[in-house]
Amino acid sequence: MITERQRQILNLIVSLYAKDHTPIGSKSLLDSIQASSATIRNDMKALERLGLIQKEHTSSGRIPSVSGYKYFVENVIQLEEFSQNDLFKVMKAFDGDFYRLSDLFKTAAKSLSELTGLTSFVLNAPQRDQQLVSFEMVILDNHSVLSVITLGTGEVRTNQFILPKSMTEADLAVFSNLVKERLVGKKVIDIHYTLRTEIPQIVQRYFKVTSEVLQLFESIFDDLFKEHLTVAGRKNIFDYATDNLAELYKLFSDDERMLHEIREITNNDEMRAVKFDNDEKFMKNLTIISQKFVIPYRGFGTLTVVGPVEMDYQRTLSVLDLVAKVLTMKLSDYYRYLDGNHYEISK
């Protein structure tokens, strides 16, 4: 446990170091702390013994340690009002109408990346809890069919496929009816179970060649069980990382691994999560910050940034909060549009 003055000193050291990345001495704190230089030095020694600050080899000043940053984020930091300049940039980016959920998420990721200079990610509400609200099949020609899946979030998934040789147009109608009767209205997690238990038995009753029908089910619904991550600023790692660049770029390009990282640190009721101590050695000097945003009546999505341990946390958290608020506002407009008997425009 640290004293209130030590808390103020840690706050100042973190804030000042974030601005110019030079070690902080006791004299730099005199104007802001009501204490003598000797008292401040003693408090700095106490913080150093606790492992919250550390000495820089080339200077007599001190810099925050990883533990210090962690303590600062969890116990000291207070969100400041976002700047008018940041507000203007975010509102300008989100100006206009959005007819695709993916475009909203791309705009959010790009805004986060540009304002923080970090790599950013946007994740929708957990797929397993989403509901399949409608299913349609459109015959394009004698051989091609388009399936259209609509989820409760308004997200539309389309899949064009070649009609199996063993299936007739009448078989296709039976297939469509099976989906509507057995799968529409269920959550994705329940659909996954139904496809592996009930559907194989039902297919045997209605179709002569079951293998191609089951393969068609898998082809249409397989993508439904995969979460999609929106990424911006992958190349920003070259600005804030010096080691293991190839490994980092590979990680940021691997949606499955990043999804695991993000879900792992946000798997609780907290609206914000920060991870400093990463198991991956090549990420030991990086911090992952995630913040949930409200998806009206559908749950919570997640905004995430990855950057150096010595990032400006005050500004980064402020920008995350700003983008989350504006994104939720635009999502409200988007769902009002969808609820007016419109459909998401899908590419």
Swiss-Prot record:
Family: Belongs to the HrcA family.
The UniProt record lists the keyword Acetylation: no
Keyword Lipoprotein included in the entry's annotation: no
Entry keyword set: Repressor, Stress response, Transcription, Transcription regulation
Lineage: Bacteria, Bacillati, Bacillota, Bacilli, Lactobacillales
Protein's UniProt name: Heat-inducible transcription repressor HrcA
HAMAP family, sorted: HrcA
Function statement: Negative regulator of class I heat shock genes (grpE-dnaK-dnaJ and groELS operons). Prevents heat-shock induction of these operons.
One Gene Ontology term of the molecular function aspect: DNA binding
GO annotation, biological process: negative regulation of DNA-templated transcription
Secretion signal span: none
Highest taxon of the lineage: Bacteria
Pfam assignment, any one: HrcA_DNA-bdg
Gene behind this protein: hrcA
